[in-house]
């Protein structure tokens, strides 16, 4: 019988970022109660030696599973130190991997207050708009003009500590696109 390999995307993340993510998840599960229904599985509850933790986030019938790993091969940089994160969407026996932005949107739609189409209509008519969007990380990069006007009208509340964002967890802070000088003096452009 030959070996079967399963390949999955694991985002390389530094250890401190993973620790921050875990503490934010635990805080919002146990203290603020904004993450009601989430399940945190510790490393000693897993049979896999490389899994450091799992966070199960119910999304209706489906669930999002964010798994953190340790002891992986070290990455390109010395600060990676073999830490990583995978993000999976599961429904019954089906599972697929999702990117961090989509994971944030799924969490946002199910767990946090946000504007709706009716809120935009109410604001245009001059009525009071509630609720505020408490989780702006769950929105796409550029919203509609109405949404942008609404966010200017009703600013989100600053929540301390912030809500856990999967996109922030896997964000690469060190490998920003390198700036190079253009052919006209000091103008800069992305060097790809």
Swiss-Prot record:
Q: Where is this site: Cleavage in virion (by viral protease)?
A: 150-151
Task: Report the residues modified as Phosphothreonine.
Answer: 96, 188
Q: Where is this region: Interaction with host APOBEC3F and APOBEC3G?
A: 54-72
Q: Where is this motif: HCCH motif?
A: 108-139
Where in the cell is the protein located? Host cytoplasm; Host cell membrane; Virion
The known PTMs are summarized as: Processed in virion by the viral protease.
Which stretches does the entry tag as region Interaction with host APOBEC3F? 14-17, 74-79
Alphabetically sorted, this entry's keywords are: AIDS, Host cell membrane, Host cytoplasm, Host membrane, Host-virus interaction, Membrane, Metal-binding, Phosphoprotein, RNA-binding, Ubl conjugation, Ubl conjugation pathway, Virion, Zinc
Q: Return the Pfam families for the record.
A: Vif
Identify the residue span(s) of motif BC-box-like motif.
144-153
Q: Where is this region: SOCS box-like?
A: 151-180
| Location of the region described as RNA-binding in the Swiss-Prot/TrEMBL record | 75-114
Q: Which family does it belong to?
A: Belongs to the primate lentivirus group Vif protein family.
Write out the function statement from the record: Counteracts the innate antiviral activity of host APOBEC3F and APOBEC3G by promoting their ubiquitination and degradation. Acts as a substrate recognition component of an E3 ubiquitin-protein ligase complex: mechanistically, Vif hijacks a host cullin-5-RING E3 ubiquitin-protein ligase complex (ECS complex) and the transcription coactivator CBFB/CBF-beta to form an active E3 ubiquitin-protein ligase complex that targets APOBEC3G and APOBEC3F for polyubiquitination, leading to their degradation by the proteasome.
HAMAP family recorded for this chain? HIV_VIF
An additional note in the Swiss-Prot or TrEMBL entry is: Vif-defective viruses show catastrophic failure in reverse transcription due to APOBEC-induced mutations that initiate a DNA base repair pathway and compromise the structural integrity of the ssDNA. In the absence of Vif, the virion is morphologically abnormal.
Subunit info here reads: Homomultimer; in vitro and presumably in vivo. Interacts with viral RNA and Pr55Gag precursor; these interactions mediate Vif incorporation into the virion. Interacts with the viral reverse transcriptase. Forms cullin-5-RING E3 ubiquitin-protein ligase complex (ECS complex) by interacting with host CUL5, RBX2, elongin BC complex (ELOB and ELOC) and CBFB/CBF-beta. Within the ECS complex, Vif interacts directly with host CUL5, ELOC and APOBEC (APOBEC3F and APOBEC3G) substrates.
Q: What is this protein called?
A: Virion infectivity factor
